[in-house]
Amino acid sequence: MHDLATIILLGIIEGLTEFLPVSSTGHLILASEMLGFTGEGSAAFKIAIQLGAILAVLVAYRARFWGVGMGLLRADPAAVAFTRNILIGFLPAMLVGAVAYEGVRALLESPATVAVALLVGGIAILAIERMVKVVKVESVEAMPLRTAIAIGAVQCIAMIPGVSRSGATIMGALLMGVERRTAAEFSFFLAVPTMMGATAYSLWKDRAILTFDDMNAIAIGLFVAFLVALVVVKAFVAIVGRFGFAPFAWYRIIVGGGALLWLAWK
């Protein structure tokens, strides 16, 4: 597909950005445009390597997931509520994604869409941070069913590249009165079924055009993304707890504005 350095660089970008509200897909699209990373398998690569970051969540929160699994065997109410909220939150993305997949893939080739979404999303994050003051939900287990459904519906907006899946779900959670750290963690957990489904669907759809080299590139990019995300996922929660989401909003505005200038100049 492309040289090893490019594949590793894209894996690093994915690992750094998947759980930040800055759009990992948007960064991959812009980076691919700058690096000339194109070809029939490139779109599948950009989706599939996100699985590496998702595996990092399973490792980083392995004790939490193990506890939930054991709790389900005992029909523990907290474990049941946790699982219910994740599955309910995943449902809207599964339904909309199945219908809108081809349209989303077309948008994946538009750096201009990414730049605008980054810019607008940054402004939205700043506005929501100022608006939200009341905390009603302090854990995933305590989240009402309607809140999980609403956050899942908001996640569908992130099918537009540059919006950010984590950004959409976290901001949606904040608007529903979810505490910051809980909002971030729910976004992580919700990513597991969402991105596993997206990766499996993308690889299945592109199975006829993916070569052995493409699959090797995906494996390398996925592994690099996993290693980097393993560090980022815990650090992000600590940063949010101390500084909130404003730093990421300003970053989006700068990158989105810079990308628009670059595209206009190019």
From Swiss-Prot:
Enzyme class: hydrolase
GO terms under cellular component: plasma membrane
GO molecular function terms listed in the Swiss-Prot or TrEMBL record: undecaprenyl-diphosphatase activity
GO BP, one annotated term: peptidoglycan biosynthetic process
Keywords: Antibiotic resistance, Cell inner membrane, Cell membrane, Cell shape, Cell wall biogenesis/degradation, Hydrolase, Membrane, Peptidoglycan synthesis, Transmembrane, Transmembrane helix
EC number: 3.6.1.27
Coiled coil: none
Transmembrane segments: 4-24, 41-61, 79-99, 108-128, 143-163, 184-204, 220-240, 243-263
Keyword Membrane attached: yes
Reactions catalysed according to its record: di-trans,octa-cis-undecaprenyl diphosphate + H2O = di-trans,octa-cis-undecaprenyl phosphate + phosphate + H(+)
Localization per Swiss-Prot or TrEMBL: Cell inner membrane
Membrane topology: Multi-pass membrane protein
Disulphide connectivity of cysteines: none
Family as reported in the entry's similarity comment: Belongs to the UppP family.
Job of this protein: Catalyzes the dephosphorylation of undecaprenyl diphosphate (UPP). Confers resistance to bacitracin.
Miscellaneous comment in the UniProt entry for this protein: Bacitracin is thought to be involved in the inhibition of peptidoglycan synthesis by sequestering undecaprenyl diphosphate, thereby reducing the pool of lipid carrier available.
HAMAP family reported in the protein's UniProt record: Undec_diphosphatase
Family annotation (PANTHER family): UNDECAPRENYL-DIPHOSPHATASE (PTHR30622:SF3)
Protein name: Undecaprenyl-diphosphatase
